Structure formats: C-alpha cells, structure tokens
Amino acid sequence: MIWCMIAALLLLAVFALSALIAEKCLQMVVNPVRYDVDYVKALETTNGFSDCIEAYETKWQRTPFVLHCAGTDISGEYMMNPADSGTPRKVAIICHGHTVNRYSDLKYADIFYRAGFSTVIFDERYFGESTGDFCTLGQNEARDVAAIIAYVRQIFGQDCVIGLHGESMGAATALLTLKYETPDFVIADCPFADSKLLFAQWLKRNLHIPIGLIWPILRRRAKRKYDYDVESVCPIAAVQGKNVPICLMHGKSDNLIPYTHSEMLRKACVNPNSELHLFENADHARSIVVARTEYERLVLAFLHNCGLYGTENKQ
C-alpha cells in the first residue's frame, strides 16, 4: 500500500511540475517582454543601422494606418517611394520578430526602398502601438498580414506586386500567410519550420526534458485560454505545394532557432526560384548584422531572379 501511495505522489508531482513548465513555456510565447521604441532604436543603432533610422525619420514619405483585425488594431505605415512609379507598383511588407516593434523592420525596409520598392512596416499584434492581449507566433498574425495585403492592394492597385520579408516570428508569419494569400515572393530570415519541433528543441537544450511531458498540457491551455492552436502553427505545412519563390536566410550559429529549420523549409519549396543562404558566425536574427553587404546582395539577386529588380532600377 505504501508503495502505491508513493507512486501516486510521484505521478502527482510529475504532473504538477509538467503543468508548471507548460504554463511557463506558454507565457514566454503569448505574453513576452515588449521592448519599446527607444530600446529598439538604440539596439538597431548599436547594430549599425542608424542610417536606416535616419532615412525613415527624415527622408521617406510616411503615411500611417490602423487596420481593425478580429478585434485588434494593427498600427503601421506605408512609405510611398517616388521611384515606384511604374505599372504595376512594387510593395514590400516587412514583419518583425518576437518582443520588438516596427523599428526592427527598418534595416530590411531600407534595402527594398533603395531598390525602388514602396514599403510597409507595422507593429504585430500585442507589440508596439498595436493592440492585442497576447501573441500567437503566427496563427493570428498571418491573418493580420493577409488584411494588410488587401489594404495594400487598395492603395497601390489590385495588380501591384507584393512581397513579404520577415525575421524570426515575422518570418514564420510571412510563410503562414501563404495559407491565405499568394504574394509574389517571400524572404524568410531565421524562421521556424514547425512550432512543436521548436518547443521540443528548446526543452531538450535548456531543461533536458522531452516534449511529451508538457505538450498535451500546453496545447489544452493554449486552446482554452487563448484559442491558440499551437500545433497548427506550422510554416512548413503552409509552404508545401505553394508556387511562390521563397528566399530563406539563416545564421549557422543560431542558438534559438537552428538553421536546420530553414533547410527543412527549403526542401518543401516547389518554386524553382527558391533559395537558401546560410551565414557563418551569425546568431539568431543577426545575419544582416554580421554580413550586411552580402545580405543585401543576396536579396537583390533574388529579386532579380524573380524578375523584380535590375541594375537600371537601383537608386
């Protein structure tokens, strides 16, 4: 009898610990720290992108907008590029990563702007000036991007060329948007391929426990509290069968999302213009930091291969 009681207590302790870890993991995703504009500006300046911030704040023609998406206000801006006067117009929508805001988009928006694209930057739900009580790593965010695409078509014309660029969570969001829209291209910088795999790798690396201990609890809590289906946040499933050129960028020293996620995604791409580029000595979301010139060259080469950029367009 005593051994049965001990076994029951041990099982109860394991369940309680699993529930605690599941809740902590869920909260890291849905209610992470939110860095303000001053923090992100300082970070981007330290990383060498003060020129992009200056161009945005002093040179670009900025038009703010707010879109109402499923009870959430998405705050953003579009920058009409005087060089983007042809037909059709060309627009790049930039999606930032977890914990930051639209100022993190500027280093990427600058590449497109100088290449003759008009650009759109925005705060993902829960971050920056957008509203929202929680984040879903791309589930709801992809629908927001689909709404932004519809808005962009109203502003720039139904026939406009639309591309997506995303970093980290923003990259996953851009890829998940393929469930709802067919952009002309996607550039995904350090995305995850599958959220369950990402959780499993994080747990093994940091807590040395298997995903099976917490996944059922985490899934139930996410669905019950946030209507968040964590298992459906699977960019690789969204990519499969979609004839959209996708350029994947990833640091080989990424300690948050291993570059193998981008390798998996590349294998799922069907468009012949899809590419994968790995950057030596680049940690998470730092490929453009460690190799800015090469990063820009690869972006422009990809756009050229897609028929969207040529030397005659460069400013």
What does each model-identified segment do?
Residues 241-243, 248-250, 254:
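Short beta-strand/loop motif that positions the catalytic acidic residue
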Residues 135-156:
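Alpha/beta-hydrolase active-site loop
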Residues 156-168:
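Alpha/beta-hydrolase fold nucleophile elbow
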